[in-house]
Amino acid sequence: MKEANTRRYIHLCLVVVLVSTIITTEAEDDRLFCIRHHKYCGHRPNRCCSGLFCRCNTFGTNCRCQSKGALGKLISGK
């Protein structure tokens, strides 16, 4: 009985660590794992760092994280 409780406790601890790691990773995702300015973003267009967005050429290629232009800033209010 004591051995079974110990296994359950260890299992519960592992689950708590895993869940907290996932939550922390999602929270830090924007800062640590974002795509920086002028870097390629075609494979993950929503991963540009804060204040940037993925902009591609007319043919949908050569996508790069760039800041919004003056008109884009005016429209979004940021």
Curated annotation (Swiss-Prot):
A GO CC term assigned to this protein in UniProt: extracellular region
Keyword Signal: yes
The keyword Disulfide bond is annotated on this UniProt entry: yes
GO molecular function: ion channel inhibitor activity; toxin activity
Propeptide: 28-31
Cystine bridges: C34-C49, C41-C54, C48-C65, C56-C63
Positions carrying Serine amide: S76
Protein's UniProt name: Xibalbin-13 1
Protein species of origin: Xibalbanus tulumensis
Source lineage: Eukaryota, Metazoa, Ecdysozoa, Arthropoda, Crustacea
